[in-house]
Amino acid sequence: VVARATDSFLYENWTDVSGFRMTDPRIVPEARLIEEITYSELRELAYMGASVVHDEAIFPLIEPGIPINIRNTHDPENKGTMIVPDREAVHPVCGIAARSGFSMINIEKTLMNRELGFALKALTVLKDNGINFEHMPTGIDTMSIIVKDEELGTRGDAIVESIKEVCHTNSVSLSRGLALIATVGK
């Protein structure tokens, strides 16, 4: 907020790490440092669990386009990670992240793609039960709805039955205990 109010040309965030890594260093200890990343790419990585800086903390800096430099107080010579409005995509993927704790509702219906409002019907069942969806990959006759396990709770079977009833599907099934893996980049 201060960086924006003072029209700063750069905001430095000093922390205990040298910036963002291409993947979780607890899983891949030799993960390379990301030298430059966009605000949007940062938000994707933060959503998936990267915790160097909270994605909402950058909002005041996005509109004026103030770059953020994540630096390490224990290694001040390290250049860290620059978070910028846009970047040249030297490498298309800048990071890979994962989050566990998801379920997938798998829906199959012949000619689903020709039925106006089909996805809306399925999503309305979730909305009526207070459940957000995280992701929704689709095919011609299939749709998968990814939801958080904690939001689904013990209502999985009831949700499956409601979708079957409302959408008149060939089949609906539920897969629990899944993780989302995201590649982030341009």
Where are these regions (language model features)?
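C-terminal catalytic "cap/lid" subdomain
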Residues: V1-K186
